Regions:
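Residue-level marker of regulatory loop/turn positions in helix-turn-helix DNA-binding domains and
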Residues: 15-16, 209, 273, 458, ...
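Terminal amphipathic alpha-helical/low-complexity segments used for targeting or macromolecular assembly
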Residues: 81, 94-225, 314-474, 559-716, ...
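Phosphopantetheine-dependent thiolation modules in NRPS/PKS and related acyl-activating systems
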Residues: 1-99
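Structural signal for interior beta-strand "rungs" in well-ordered beta-sheet cores
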Residues: 221-222, 227-325, 470-471, 476-574, ...
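Secondary-structure boundary/capping signal
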Residues: 34-36, 68, 91, 144, ...
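N-terminal alpha-helical segment
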Residues: 35-36, 67, 213, 281, ...
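Alpha-helix initiation/capping motif
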Residues: 12-16, 72-76, 106, 210, ...
């Protein structure tokens, strides 16, 4: 059978095979009136780009025969005839969908009620950490003769004790609630699930980021039940089932690693073992599901994903999403592990203990100038019209007083952190260093300052103020650079050119640790280059000008990148062309007027200060009611009051953000706005307040409960019944639609906006019913995921892409999963 491509004209080739017929028809609708030839290049001849490639793949998938065509196929083949050959070689039969029965509403809500009863305890314990030093300071400064210096020292001591107690409480809760977990498959919303969930929430509450990269971290994991060998270095990891993690001697684990050995799929909790054998190496931003292993000297490279049941053989290197063998590891080329004396190891442990307490104190001390300033405002009766008002009036009064005081707190914290960094440590230099060296210890403390700032000063990121913060820490940051919440940054090694853009959660130039050695190399992102959300930029990377690294993508080797390139995926593939937004004037993207700079600075200043002002205002208001109970030594009443206030504060944060979202933004709809416009500032402000207030104080406790979808629906999402959500990573809420009984695991993200070309583009994400999203999988805007689809870990669904119903996909970008 031969047919002419519809509407393509006489210059088109005649489609002959089944693949050509489908391809020519799809191309004719994408490029009406253009000749369709077998030797034509989709990008250079037809003018295709990344968005059109996704649309073409989606159009072809309408035919079940071609449901497994991928965007990567189009990028790699390019020529129309070659793409048609891929279609003709497609398998004739698709895998049959797996039938499963979602848990009943009775089981779900029975567990939900039990979870709701546990929430006040969890929230109150978090509240105690910052209310206890508040209480101590005001208890000891109630009389004119009291010593402010003594009250300050006592408050710091109580804060540090509360910080240490958080670890102890998390440890005790884990063993009391769940004991030792065993691998297996358990019903979702059952007893084992509830116990795992409660223990996971309690362990998550401990500030483990303070231990990252230190020799204290393995001790903490052992205390929680993991089997950890000697000479193990762990940069930073999330572990979902500690009892099922086994790490051998000499293992190195990078930053931002996710050991997702507990996940929910098809109405069941899957608990599996993860084993890293002696001298294995796990790169940064790796995801490992349960029932996975890495053999001796095996290497799993950064930004890779290992799905359930996979294993890296001894001495092999695996890379990518999904991870595949890329060669042998040269053990002979690995330098010998440096010998370290027991005395040095003991001294390092003491240094890390001191460093943890120092960093914790550093980010707490600036609260005292805030106390002094508010107390002075109070004695001067600055706001007399609030005198004699009730609790709400007191709260409003202290919020207004706390606003300028919180600005002082933030500035003092930034300056104190920078001062410590420069007074104590010189500028780090590139090179290879032993992990048991003074250079490593210096790098660790500098990294801890930056990492702690992500938790304490999170509002600064993605604002006009973030470049100044990085410069204070030692990074070289060009004019008009935009930097969001980058991770793993070694400031002395980082250079960002003018007008660069670093999106959320980018792992940016972190050190590489392997075999007892740490390597640091300069990382450069040049003029107007862009790194997308969740991207990985290895240390030593030099990105030329105008380069774009896509969402969840790795930067390729320096020798492969040229000016203006676009790279996507893990491993990365080169995109010959991408969709670009034109028409926005540079005055709204790269060259704003002084007035716009001032306006944005004011809006972002308010968003930075507000979370701290709310905390301080609530703290002062609570103290007014709490002090009389303490004076009467009614300690039982004090604890009960704290429990009630803790839950009220948590829910209040959520209700405040929900009200602000509807009042300020209304309902999100599809749109595109240049970065230097009020809509973008306000939208990003709501997102920042959500991530800084509602998410940590309320939403994160609802992860894994039937209450989280209801909370998101109040914010504007459309989430069906029975949806399981272990993620809070949603921003433009009204643009998210999730069908009934779908399962979104940890870090899964329906991403409703992108900032390419400094234009904020927002559109809908539609996820069907009974869809499974694995850990850190992402669906970009304008994409549709069909019913019963399965997305593996670290899978990226491109914007405009359509994932067929009842199909399995894995990879970055998504490709058919043969599992």
């Amino acid at each position: 059978m031969t047919v002419d491509a519809a509407g393509a004209g006489a210059e088109s080739d005649v489609a002959e095979t089944e693949g050509e017929i489908a391809l020519f028809a799809a191309l004719a609708s994408l490029f009406p009136g253009m000749p369709i030839r077998r030797d034509a290049d989709f990008f250079t001849d037809l003018g295709g780009h990344s968005f059109f490639a996704a649309r073409l793949a989606s159009a072809l998938r309408v035919n079940p025969r071609f449901a497994q065509i991928t965007v990567r196929d189009i990028y790699q083949q390019r020529r129309i005839g070659a793409i048609a050959e891929v279609l003709d070689q497609a398998p004739q039969e698709m895998a049959a969908p797996v039938d499963w029965t979602p848990p009943s509403a009775w089981r779900r809500w029975r567990c939900g009620v039990a979870q709701a009863l546990a929430l006040p305890v969890m929230v109150s314990l978090r509240m105690t950490q910052w209310l206890a030093p508040f209480f101590t300071y005001h208890l000891l400064t109630g009389s004119p003769d009291d010593s402010v210096a003594l009250a300050t020292l006592a408050s710091i001591s109580v804060f540090l004790i509360a910080t240490v107690l958080q670890f102890f409480i998390a440890w005790a809760a884990k063993w009391l609630i769940v004991g030792r977990l065993k691998p297996g498959i358990y019903p979702l919303w059952g007893v084992t699930y509830f116990r795992w969930w409660a223990a996971d929430r309690m362990v998550e509450s401990a500030p483990t980021y303070l231990l990252s990269g230190s020799s204290l971290y393995p001790l903490w994991l052992r205390a929680l039940g993991a089997k950890i060998g000697e000479e193990v270095i762990i940069g930073g990891a999330t572990v979902r089932a500690h009892d099922l993690l086994e790490i051998g001697d000499g293992v190195s684990v990078g930053n931002g690693v996710s050991f997702e050995n507990a996940r929910v799929e098809r109405g069941q909790l899957h608990l599996g073992r993860i084993a890293l054998q002696d001298n294995a190496c796990v790169g940064s931003y790796v995801i490992m599901e349960g029932n996975t292993a890495i053999g001796p000297w095996g290497h799993l490279e950064a930004q890779s994903a290992m799905a359930d049941g996979r294993e890296v053989p001894a001495g092999r290197i695996w890379q990518g999403s999904p991870a595949r063998d890329v060669g042998a590891f040269d053990t002979l080329g690995q330098p010998a592990r440096p010998v370290t004396s027991p005395a040095r190891l003991r001294a390092e442990k003491l240094f890390f203990v001191f460093g943890v307490l120092l960093v914790a104190t550093l980010f707490f001390i600036p609260v005292f100038p805030t106390f002094f300033l508010i107390d002075w405002f109070d004695t001067q009766n600055v706001l007399p019209w609030f005198e004699g008002s009730g609790p709400l009036g007191q709260l409003a009064c202290y919020f207004l007083l706390a606003f300028p005081a919180s600005a002082v707190l933030i500035v003092a914290t930034v300056l104190a952190s920078a001062a410590l960094r420069w007074i104590v440590f010189p500028r780090l230099k590139p090179g290879r260093y032993a992990v048991h060296s003074n250079t490593y210890c210096a790098k660790w403390l500098i990294s801890q300052i930056q990492e702690a700032s992500l938790n304490v000063l999170s509002g600064i990121y993605a604002t006009v103020y973030s470049p100044f913060w990085y410069r204070l820490l030692g990074a070289k940051v060009g004019r008009d650079a935009e930097i969001s919440s980058a991770q793993g940054v070694i400031p002395d090694m980082l250079t960002l050119g003018d007008e660069t853009f670093i999106a959320d959660a980018v792992m940016l130039g972190d050190e590489r640790i392997d075999g007892g050695w740490m390597t640091m190399q300069p990382t450069v992102v040049s003029h107007r280059s862009f790194v997308g959300n969740g991207g990985y930029i290895a240390d030593g990377t030099v990105l030329p000008e105008n380069v774009l690294i896509g969402v969840h993508s790795c930067a390729p080797h320096n020798s492969k990148v040229a000016d203006g390139d676009t790279w996507l995926g893990s491993p990365p593939i080169h995109l010959p062309a991408r969709e670009q937004v034109s028409g926005a004037p540079e005055s709204l993207t790269f060259k704003p007027s002084p007035l716009r700079r001032l306006a944005r600075g004011l809006v972002e200043g308010v968003r930075i200060v507000t979370p701290h002002a709310v905390v301080i205002a609530v703290g002062y208001t609570v103290m007014l009611d709490l002090m009389p109970l303490a004076d009467q030594e009614r300690w039982g009443a004090v604890l009960a009051y704290l429990a009630v206030i803790g839950m009220a504060y948590s829910v209040g944060n959520f209700l405040l953000i929900a009200a602000l979202k509807w009042l300020v933004m209304g309902r999100y709809r599809k749109r595109a706005d240049p970065m230097w416009t009020p809509f973008v500032w306000l939208s990003e402000g709501i997102t920042s307040l959500y991530e800084g207030m509602a998410a940590p104080n309320f939403m994160r406790y609802l992860r894994g409960t039937p209450w989280l979808p209801l909370a998101f629906n109040l914010l504007g999402c459309k989430i069906g019944r029975g949806v399981y959500m272990d993620t809070t990573d949603i921003t433009e809420f009204d643009c998210v639609s999730i069908g009934a009984d779908s399962e979104l695991n940890a870090g899964a993200c329906p991403q409703t906006h992108l900032f390419e070309d400094r234009v904020m583009k927002i559109d809908h994400v539609s996820i069907g019913e009974r869809v499974y999203m694995g850990p850190r999988s992402a669906v970009l805007y304008s994409a549709v995921v069909g019913n019963d689809a399965h997305l593996g870990p670290l899978t990226l669904v491109m914007k405009g892409e359509h994932i067929p119903a009842c199909s399995r996909w894995a990879g970055c970008p998504a490709a058919p999963d043969k599992a």
